[in-house]
């Protein structure tokens, strides 16, 4: 899965987006894809990308623990066969929408935290 993602991203050559494979920080025997966004080059924030991926249909959930450092991680452990393509196709779709400003592309860390907390707590209602 990770090799497919690396190949896909290398072909797309998204400006301001870099990526790397990292070991799972919890010690599990899996690797993750860490996605970095340089908003000065990409013209959108990592928070915008993460937010719109999670609001997408289908939703693509990211590991956003360190999003304030301008990166998130994609985890492969819960994907079923073929879903790795869906993840990349939806990532591409969201990036193109962010680049064309069809969706909000300047979500700040503060705004992202507020939106995330509201969504997280919305199930209480």
Task: Indicate where each model-derived feature is located.
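Conserved C-terminal alpha-helix-loop-beta "cap" of PLP-dependent enzymes
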Residues: 8-107
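Structural signal for terminal/edge beta-strands and the immediately following C-terminal loop/tail
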Residues: 97-125
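Structural signature of PLP-dependent enzymes
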Residues: 1-7
């Amino acid at each position: 899965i990770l090799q497919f993602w690396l190949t896909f991203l290398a072909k797309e050559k998204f400006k301001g987006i870099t990526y790397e494979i990292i070991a799972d920080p919890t010690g599990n025997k899996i690797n993750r894809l860490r996605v970095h966004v340089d908003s000065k080059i990409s013209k959108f924030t990592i928070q915008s990308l993460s937010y719109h991926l999670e609001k997408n249909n289908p939703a693509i959930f990211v590991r956003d623990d360190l999003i304030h450092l301008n990166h998130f991680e994609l985890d492969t452990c819960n994907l079923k066969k073929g879903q790795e393509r869906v993840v990349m196709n939806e990532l591409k779709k969201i990036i193109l929408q962010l680049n064309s400003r069809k969706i909000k592309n300047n979500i700040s860390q503060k705004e992202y935290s507020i939106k995330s907390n509201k969504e997280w707590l919305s199930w209480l209602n």
